[in-house]
């Protein structure tokens, strides 16, 4: 029988549409800067649409994943292994950034006097209360009310409530089936909405890129270009050497994985926010063969604790400012910087500008590097945010697959099949593919039913 070709025409693929949108945005922003800046609402509107759906998707995914598990001990094991992975790999990212910036030294010879820098532009990032302390950060994980957590879209707060709800629903056994089925069906509705939102992703990427080029100009890319080139190169080394090695040790190719999430990467490239594809990334990973409970726990947590691109940026930017302002940093001072960053880097979120806020807080905490030096990189920070967001996204995707492999929640055969023989429908509409699968409550435990 003749094989039917289900491939879409190129012009209908999200991959092609986003590429065209990004190029169009660059052209408009470069030749018509005022018009480019006016496109900002398109990018902002797209990200707001995504943020609108993130909290309920995380809630549904985590609840269904946990309530559907046979062994509750696996939830704690999954969370513990995820945090261990995050700490080790983000530490490697910090060390890699520190190593390369000391080898290349892009700031050496600039001889900038910090007192001559215009610090008005960085005032918004260095004001009081911009960066939480450790205790404040932990307390902020607990919402004032459940409604408040959803209303503000606080990912970790929603995650905490979802985990507790999932445990409680699991304890009900068969009596909780009605609630479980409702939440499971509701999650499919939400992912269908995500599919609708992604139809306008090219418009969002176009607007965000046109605004960036129109406001900051291509010329700002040429200034401080050595730092940008060094940072982008370091991110590539981290992705293909560090993450590539981790992927290979766990049975998959980083090249094939990147190809699998290419649409998400292009959207992130256009919007500079890895959060813009969080719901779609969850659908993609579940479609890849990762159990729903692992996806629901690892991905949202990773957006606060596993920001590899941001970690690289923080060490490189801090040492670059020291080099440019002729501020000597000996080994002890650099190790102190590293220790502070191990804490402050966990306070960044997957949104545009968070890395700059964390950097400002870190320089203030260390005290050795002049905070005024932030003005040096303010103009190009927006352009480096693309590499940060892309690296963060790939890092969280790899982390989810690895943790799933460790806990036995990864369908290896399905993953290999998806990475090798992905169809256009799976690439463009993972939300639709999920509708072909179903999750069920575990078998009723009579003892649990009697206790309830």
Swiss-Prot record:
<feature type="region of interest" description="Disordered">
    <location>
        <begin position="417"/>
        <end position="452"/>
    </location>
</feature>
<feature type="compositionally biased region" description="Acidic residues">
    <location>
        <begin position="421"/>
        <end position="432"/>
    </location>
</feature>
<keyword id="KW-0769">Symport</keyword>
<keyword id="KW-1133">Transmembrane helix</keyword>
<feature type="transmembrane region" description="Helical">
    <location>
        <begin position="227"/>
        <end position="247"/>
    </location>
</feature>
<keyword id="KW-0812">Transmembrane</keyword>
<dbReference type="InterPro" id="IPR001991">
    <property type="entry name" value="Na-dicarboxylate_symporter"/>
</dbReference>
<feature type="transmembrane region" description="Helical">
    <location>
        <begin position="14"/>
        <end position="34"/>
    </location>
</feature>
<keyword id="KW-0472">Membrane</keyword>
<comment type="similarity">
    <text>Belongs to the dicarboxylate/amino acid:cation symporter (DAACS) (TC 2.A.23) family.</text>
</comment>
<keyword id="KW-1003">Cell membrane</keyword>
<protein>
    <recommendedName>
        <fullName>C4-dicarboxylate transport protein 2</fullName>
    </recommendedName>
</protein>
<comment type="function">
    <text>Responsible for the transport of dicarboxylates such as succinate, fumarate, and malate from the periplasm across the membrane.</text>
</comment>
<dbReference type="GO" id="GO:0015138">
    <property type="term" value="F:fumarate transmembrane transporter activity"/>
</dbReference>
<feature type="transmembrane region" description="Helical">
    <location>
        <begin position="49"/>
        <end position="69"/>
    </location>
</feature>
<feature type="transmembrane region" description="Helical">
    <location>
        <begin position="357"/>
        <end position="377"/>
    </location>
</feature>
<feature type="transmembrane region" description="Helical">
    <location>
        <begin position="149"/>
        <end position="169"/>
    </location>
</feature>
<dbReference type="InterPro" id="IPR036458">
    <property type="entry name" value="Na:dicarbo_symporter_sf"/>
</dbReference>
<feature type="transmembrane region" description="Helical">
    <location>
        <begin position="294"/>
        <end position="314"/>
    </location>
</feature>
<keyword id="KW-0997">Cell inner membrane</keyword>
<keyword id="KW-0813">Transport</keyword>
<dbReference type="Pfam" id="PF00375">
    <property type="entry name" value="SDF"/>
</dbReference>
<dbReference type="GO" id="GO:0015141">
    <property type="term" value="F:succinate transmembrane transporter activity"/>
</dbReference>
<feature type="transmembrane region" description="Helical">
    <location>
        <begin position="336"/>
        <end position="356"/>
    </location>
</feature>
<feature type="transmembrane region" description="Helical">
    <location>
        <begin position="81"/>
        <end position="101"/>
    </location>
</feature>
<dbReference type="InterPro" id="IPR018107">
    <property type="entry name" value="Na-dicarboxylate_symporter_CS"/>
</dbReference>
<dbReference type="GO" id="GO:0015366">
    <property type="term" value="F:malate:proton symporter activity"/>
</dbReference>
<dbReference type="GO" id="GO:0005886">
    <property type="term" value="C:plasma membrane"/>
</dbReference>
<feature type="transmembrane region" description="Helical">
    <location>
        <begin position="189"/>
        <end position="209"/>
    </location>
</feature>
<dbReference type="GO" id="GO:0070778">
    <property type="term" value="P:L-aspartate transmembrane transport"/>
</dbReference>
<keyword id="KW-0614">Plasmid</keyword>
<dbReference type="InterPro" id="IPR023954">
    <property type="entry name" value="C4_dicarb_transport"/>
</dbReference>
């Amino acid at each position: 029988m003749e094989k039917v070709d289900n491939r879409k025409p190129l012009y209908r693929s999200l991959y092609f549409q986003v590429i065209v949108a990004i190029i169009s945005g660059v052209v408009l922003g470069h030749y018509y800067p005022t018009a480019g800046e006016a496109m900002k609402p398109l990018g902002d509107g797209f990200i707001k649409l995504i943020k609108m759906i993130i909290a309920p998707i995380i809630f549904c995914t985590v609840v269904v994943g946990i309530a559907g598990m046979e062994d509750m001990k696996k939830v704690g094991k999954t969370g513990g292994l995820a945090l261990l992975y995050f700490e080790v790999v983000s530490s490697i990212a910090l060390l890699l950034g520190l190593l390369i910036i000391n080898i290349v030294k892009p700031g050496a010879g600039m001889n900038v006097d910090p007192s001559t820098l215009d610090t008005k532009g960085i005032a918004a990032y260095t004001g009081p209360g911009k960066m939480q302390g450790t205790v404040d950060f932990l307390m902020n994980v607990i919402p004032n009310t459940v409604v408040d957590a959803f209303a503000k879209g606080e990912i970790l707060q929603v995650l905490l409530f979802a985990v507790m709800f999932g445990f409680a629903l699991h304890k009900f056994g068969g009596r909780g089936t009605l609630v479980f089925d409702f939440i499971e069906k509701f999650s499919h509705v939400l992912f269908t909405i995500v599919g609708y939102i992604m139809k306008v992703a090219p418009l969002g990427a176009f607007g965000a890129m046109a605004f960036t080029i129109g406001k900051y100009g291509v010329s700002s890319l040429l200034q401080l270009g050595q730092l940008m080139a060094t940072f982008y190169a370091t991110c590539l080394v981290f992705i293909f050497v560090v993450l590539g090695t981790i992927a290979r040790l766990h049975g998959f190719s980083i090249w094939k994985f990147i190809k699998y999430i290419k649409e998400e990467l292009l959207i992130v490239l256009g919007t500079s926010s890895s959060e813009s594809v969080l719901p779609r990334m969850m659908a993609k990973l579940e479609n890849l063969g990762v159990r729903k409970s692992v996806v629901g726990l690892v991905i949202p947590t990773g957006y606060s604790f596993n920001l590899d691109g941001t970690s690289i940026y923080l060490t490189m930017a801090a040492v670059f400012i020291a080099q440019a302002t002729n501020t000597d940093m000996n080994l002890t001072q650099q190790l102190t910087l590293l220790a502070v960053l191990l804490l402050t880097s966990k306070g960044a979120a997957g949104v545009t500008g968070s890395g700059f806020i964390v950097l400002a807080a870190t320089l203030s905490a260390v005290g050795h590097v002049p905070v005024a030096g932030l003005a040096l990189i303010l103009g190009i920070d927006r352009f480096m945010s693309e590499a940060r967001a892309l690296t963060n996204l790939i890092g969280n995707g790899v982390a989810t697959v690895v943790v799933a492999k460790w806990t036995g929640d990864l369908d290896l055969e399905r993953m290999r099949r998806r990475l090798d023989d992905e169809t256009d429908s799976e690439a463009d509409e993972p939300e639709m593919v999920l509708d072909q699968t179903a999750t069920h409550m575990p078998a009723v435990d009579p003892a649990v039913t009697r206790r309830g």
